[in-house]
Amino acid sequence: MSIKLPLSNINSGGNSNNSSSSNSTSNNNININIGNGIPTNIEKMTFEDSETQKLNIKQQSNNNTSTSVCVSSIHSSSPISSPTSHQVNKSSGSLPPVIKRSPTTTHHHNSSGSNSSSSSSGSNNNNNQIKTSNGMNKPNPTGFLFGSKPRENSQNKIDDNKGVNLAVSTSNSSNNFHKSHSESNIININAPPVETVNMEEIYNNIPSSISMENIRENENNNNSSNNNSNNNNNNNNNNNNSNNINNVNGNKSSLASSTSSISSLSSVSTLSTSNAATNTNTNANTTSTTKTTSTVRSTSPTQFKPRVEFDENNPNAIILSRQRCKSISSPSDFRLNPPSNVHMPTSSLSTSTSTTNVNGLLLPNGVGGVSMSFTPSGLPMTPPTNSSQVDTLQMSTESITIQPSSLDSSSESVSDGLQSVSGSPVTASPSPTISNNTNATTTNNNNNTNTNNNNNNNNNQHNHHHHQHSHSQQHDVYQIKKENFPSSPTSPTLLPSETHDFSSEYSSNPGGKCAICRKPLWSFPISDKSRRCRDCSLVVHRACVPLATECPSAKKSPSKLSVPNGNQSNSSSSSSSSSSSSSSSNSSSSNTKGHSRTPSSPSVSSIPGFQLTSNASQNLHVNSHTLSLLVNGATIDSNHYKRNKKSLEAGARDFHFIFRGCGIPLDEFPLDSYVCGLYSYFAHGRLYLTESYVCFYDGFVFDRTKERTKIIKVSNIASIEKRSSGLNPSAIKIKTFDDQSFIFTHFMHREVAFDDLEGLLIHQESLHFAHSIVANNFPGMNEAIRGQTKRLLSRARLDGHYQIHSKIRCPMPSKEILLMSAIKNNNLDMVVTLLNYYCQVNSDEINSVDSKGYTPLHNAVFSECSDQIFMHLLNQKEVRVRERNMDGNTPLHYFCQKFKSPECQRIVQAMIEKGANINEQNYNGETPLHKAIFNHSVRLLMVYILLKNNANVNIVNNAGESPLHYAVRLGRLDVAKMLLAAGADPTIISLRDRKTALALAVDYDVCPEISDLLRRLDTITTSLEMYELEKFQASLVVEELQKENVVARLDEKLLDKIGCTDKEERRKFLSLKSNRLLIHHPARTQGAKIILKEMETMDIKNGKLIISETELEYTEKIGSGASGKVFKGIYRGRVVAIKVLKSADDEMTREDFLKEFGVLASLESHTIVGLYGVVLEPKICLVMEYCSNGSIYHSIRKNPPSWERFFSFVQQMLAGINALHQSTPQVLHRDIKTLNFLVNHNNKVKVADFGLSRFNTESNQETLNKTRGTSVYCAPEVFEGKEYNERSDMYSMGIVMWEIVYCVVYGCYMIPYQEYNKMFNAFQVALLVNSSKRVLRPTIPIGVPQVLKDLIYCLWDHDVSSRPTATEAMTALAVCEKEYKQNKAQWELVITKKEPTPLPRVAPLPAFPGYRQFYEQNLDIKPIPEEEQIYQEAMEKQRRNQEASANRNQKNKELLNNNN
């Protein structure tokens, strides 16, 4: 099937069997032969918008006669001979020059037809003829509509009430793509006036360099190959007896420059049709008329855009039309499946799989729609949003050949209408290359053969097109090919939907057209000639309402339109394609016309947010962050067509092309756009909204002195309002701060536009508002509040949710809540103003939360704001004080932990009155009382106000710890006393480490006073339980907290104070006072009874327990000695050390036990190992505090200490000895050595092993005079049998200090005196220690600072009175530590970590009577040189060496100076 309008007469027969065609080159008539060819998919062809010349055709029907149509005269400026007159010959008469079509269409079926057809040959005259031959046997659904609205002064006017029906039918001539029955479409031509085609401009655009001889010469080069394919087609069809014109692509005729615009189609001079039969049936009469009209020559060529569309009434029909620079959307109530393949120019095409509205050739989804835009008179067109691949359109001076063809998958192109991919604008009007088609072959039945031939021919043309591209860019060859379309997979599919709901519409857009008849909706005066569907926004003429198809709106039916892919070879995943040649050739640019500014079109890659990528198939994809418009899917919601607006990507290209160079940054993107007018009664431009600007582009300004653009800063807009009056029923007025007013009229969607504009203003005001708060700009914030208050109170949308806010990309200056920012700035005035503003606009900002769940109250605590800010927040009526953050903490939790002001009690009370739960637990189980323990500034004040408001002190967290555990861990004695006074239970065992508060205090040992306090309270609690006096526990605890030893202070007055009035209870209390030894179980054995009787007379502090063996658990043996064994065990959940002695029946054992127990029971100090109780049966046991790190002896042997550790250990040992010596009565240890100083897990040193310890009393003088202890640690007076006193303990302490110093310096341990070889006999040591001539002591390492050596010398001085006490030694040691800290480097140099050389051997001393005098008189033993003397000699030698070296250097310098 082909459609041609040749310059020469082309006659086509109506019947395929006996029709013939004759071509005469001398004939300049335009003949349109419509005969009984194969059924075609083309139903309507329309050329619109020509300015001066009109091709007016009016067809009058005759069922039995052929029809000729007269065409207007066209004058061409080309060398080709132009026709001078135009006639349409018909046997029965002439036709009027205008064909008018009715908007209503009916359908009927023709079951039969005639096989006869007539052919006519044109004579040699200057008439352009259109001959229509009637063939009834094979009716074709082909209807033609030439022309548009006639001029008012035209003499050929048509009565609007008269019309002609065009009968269009389809026959089942192919099993592949036609229905099983014939159809004919009766189209009543009675539509409003339409615009006509300026045929003169078609001729004027033919380049003068082209002649028919060149065309024929090019044609003959390929004639043979085309004839071969034609012969094959004829053999397959067996019914083609006419020499039809086939598409021939010669060397020059196949040139298709990739830079050419679709406007080159305006140079087409003729249109021909062959093998297309049309039955034109009228309603009643069959008359024929002929008329001739003359035309007026046009002085300026008009640029056109072709459009191809499918008709909604005939699925197999295509509308080919031309319009001036306007994009008309296809009807929104249907979607079409893609027929197979249509190919268009590669230079300015944009391909996609989903399109209905393309500037240029408009094809439905998947049909091969082409988007080709150009800019006549400088009016920028909408860039393509969706399109499909289209091949070249071959154009000729004699004909345009429109044939079905296969889609050439090798042809790939991308076009954006305004710009190429490289960013250069396309040429507005390139000169086409024209070819003369002399042979055309169509196929009727065999679709496969025809498709293959056309594919081969098409590939040759495509290859040659690229070959010729480099030689010339002035020639464009366009070709539209369309093969037989299978009806089943590619026919349009309409899913069920509902009926339209039309309402009257005042059409004010001159570019708007009816979705049914495609005619303009707008006319003067404005009236209600149009109707709009309330559901899908379909706009049609009032007369076209009956033709409207069913409404697919989602409001009535959720059905969606299925768009299957008609071409499986071309994958739908390819969104757009572009060949390298077409991309590179698009760099040529042309000047746009009519702009006051002429900005160059930006490339896609230069627009922020757009990205070009390529895949393996050389296809280019345009990606955008805002919207993916390259739709590959087959199911699309019909609501997509509700609003007739451009896509975001297309709008972005338009926007940047129009307003580039106008001061708008490139990162500005149009959020939305609307068709409207400025101070006008009709819509003539487009309004763009960006985040910072309101931009208007005037499409009807042709004066170069006037600007097309109007730009308003959003920040400069003072107010907006709706206007509805007179001829401006839908207007928006914008007033700026500089007293300018802009009225935008005739919005199609004014409510949406106003809503978006209002949302944009509120967003800008919010930005200014936020910037002022973040910058702590109080005046700026006040100004923003005044404007925003007025806006919010007068806004149209009360819910405050604007759709445009989801499109805005500009973030706020801070992610924080604005009120929080003001609180962080600690600006009282700003916070108060904000609170008043939020109250005025009924905002709940006071309770807003951030990403972590923090409210402004939470934030106020962390910001350390003033008390006034906090009180203003609490005084807000709607403030919620129980809001939790992501950790479950309320503002009260953080307030108790973080707040530092002494006014905290007033604020806590205010929060409690507002409803804060004082016992609220966070996700860790902590209450505000737990948090208050961590407050370092107002801890007691916080705890007091919480306890005053009845806070529960025994609530435990997830680890089972109460607030008392927290106080013990932090060592807060004052808080612990306050909690205990409020009823805190010290016996609560935690879940984490299974410890009570007392056990935790002992382990941590942060504050010894807490341990002592908890021990006393534990004793009181146990005593009251034994005597069944638990109800007085709280009163006695309070008394104990106020003053220690409440049990010892019990008297009648105190009993009255605590409320004890019962005589029996008072007797129990007095008995408790006298028996401070608390016995749980009575003794059974005689030895145990003796011990108990002796223990009752002892002065036992705070009451020690008699423990049953069943309460102990032995876990590990840790040592043994002469007096017994030591085990590690557990008592009441506490790790203890259990010293097991012999049986209580042994008298010596009882005596030693009672003395040691008496000393331990009388001592209460954190420097002494604690005693928990005793076990009397079956063996005597002492239950004492466990020290996990062992003794000092084991500690220094395992890990040699540093100087810091040395001072720490010695200070604690001296403190422990001082505690013994300061006790009443005084306790003398008598066995001081490194083994008897224990170290717990916190490296705290405690004095232990009091088996040899005695009270320094007169009754113990005999015992104290006995030699006891380890010989190397014993003082000389002990060996001589003199009285043992506290300074004897200090001698032993000097030896212990030497042991530790030796480990520090040499990094190893040595027993005292071991440096003297083979002197291990204790008697020999005692002899040398007490010798009057020689005083033997351990050797102090060389280099030890003198201040420390002096202290050691004093401690082991032979003269008892010269030795310091424990207190004096502690003071001297503090001086040594101070000097160490001041000269740390010098002290560190002493540490050598090398063991010294042994000193000379000392001869052994024999044991015989008179040995002392013998050795003193006869033994010639040289005294050992003092280490101090050796050290001084070494230092003196070093000094002399340094002085000699300095003298030598000085002499050398003097000699050098003399020589110079």
Curated annotation (Swiss-Prot):
Q: Where is this region: Interaction with 14-3-3 protein?
A: 467-667
Q: Where is the composition biased (Low complexity)?
A: 8-32, 61-86, 111-128, 220-259, 272-300, 405-422, 435-461, 486-497, 569-608
Q: A single GO BP annotation from the record?
A: culmination involved in sorocarp development
Query: Know the name of this protein?
Result: Ankyrin repeat-containing protein kinase A
Q: Where is the composition biased (Basic residues)?
A: 462-472
Q: Which Pfam families match?
A: Ank_2, C1_1, GRAM, Pkinase
Keyword Coiled coil attached: yes
Q: Could you tell me where the Basic and acidic residues compositional bias lies?
A: 149-162
Q: What are the cysteine partners in each disulfide bond?
A: none
Query: What does the UniProt entry say about where the protein is found?
Result: Cytoplasm, Cytoskeleton; Membrane; Nucleus
Q: Where does ATP bind?
A: 1118-1126, 1139
User: Where in this chain does the entry annotate a coiled-coil region?
Assistant: 1425-1460
Knocked-out gene: effects: Null cells show weak and late developmental defects.
Q: Where are the zinc fingers (Phorbol-ester/DAG-type)?
A: 499-551
Region (Disordered) location: 1-32, 57-181, 216-259, 272-311, 329-354, 374-510, 551-608, 1434-1460
Top class in the EC scheme: transferase
What molecular function terms (GO) are annotated for this protein? Answer: ATP binding; protein serine kinase activity; protein serine/threonine kinase activity; zinc ion binding
Catalysed reactions, as listed in the record:
L-seryl-[protein] + ATP = O-phospho-L-seryl-[protein] + ADP + H(+); L-threonyl-[protein] + ATP = O-phospho-L-threonyl-[protein] + ADP + H(+)
**Record function comment:** Involved in the development of the fruiting body. Overexpression phenocopies the spnA null phenotype.
